Amino acid sequence: YTDKANTSLANKEINLLWTASWESTIGTNDLVPQNAVYDITDLLKGTTLYNSMDAGQWEATKYNGKNYFIPVYKDNVEGYDLMFRQELVDKYSWDLSTVKKLADIEPMLADAKSEGLKYPFLTQKTAMFYRYYINSFDFFTADATSNWVAVDRDTNEVVDVIQTPEYKEFCDLMAKWAEAGYISEDDVTKTTTDTTTQTQDWAISWWTDIPVNAEANSRYNQEVAMVPITDRWAHSTSALGSCYCITANSTEEQAKACIDFMGLLYTDSKLADMYTFGIEGEDFNYDANGQIAKTENGKYNHSMWESASATIVTPEAGEPADKASLYKDFNGGANTSCAAGFRFDKTPVADKYAACQTVFEQYGFALENGGVASSEVDSTIAAYQSALDEAGYQDVLAEFQSQYDAWKK
């Protein structure tokens, strides 16, 4: 999708685009500096689209005081859970109430290993430090490949994450688990797939916390249980985890047409259901309770979070009928980060920033997925830092610190 969308952008073939803060190449932090998106600030007020959500959503998604993006109203705060296959919870009588931090699941991983499972701890080929440790840091880049810089919540200062005790703690734990056989080499080599979670080959993985976590049962075709491993936080990027934008090549007439269409998508349940679930009678049906029942042969594969507002998309069968109010309560119950509202402009150090991201792929990903022996974690972290510095990291860090200090004033 990213490649196709980027090509269409370059060729000026499109007016409306879905993106997200975590997307690469076409992410929100890429498009604004490139002047690739339309400033819709003056076109929004008084429209059906603007009135479809509270003003706070529009404020939270501004860049430099201007609206460029149309947030999908969903779980617009950030938090993470550990996800357990319920079958194993029942079989081994795991007491999930004892799980307060990541290391607490170690006895359960031992059970999963004895079960003969291929993936006792499934990382889903994801470097997770920047998610598991959001109680300590605001990783305002919202990108694993640049998790080497963050705001320390205790000091409200930008820090070199690689040098923190927390980073070493996490890498040591992942190395230990890999050597115990709890993490598979498949995650390190990125050969696990997006459907591995639908199998019975794993025991414990991660999940992005949402108002209705029971959605995971249908997504993974099995019952799972969730335990929060972080608090929920409102970040600069959390409300942009799924959004739309109008391309800068659009005329004002085209931009207004896009806003009119999005107003319908965010307020008309029939259109929202069609865009989210496909064709009624072919991809889905409404059950006796008026909820969505997907068909077995349905070919449409969208989800609410990437489609339309949670307040208007019809809940799926088995979901709470009051899903809309659950989302409003969920978003309202989060902590607000000290760095909420800050957006880093990487333009002054773009080449060095990109070079540091490449270094992450060389060192950071393996460190965070158990791909480094326990005896070599310290030396690898040192080599990682050295390679970052050679790539220009200190200049990038200084630019982060300068921009953040200026923003705090």
Residues covered by each model-derived region:
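Extracytoplasmic "Venus flytrap"/periplasmic binding protein-like
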Residues: 1-56, 62, 87-97, 114, ...
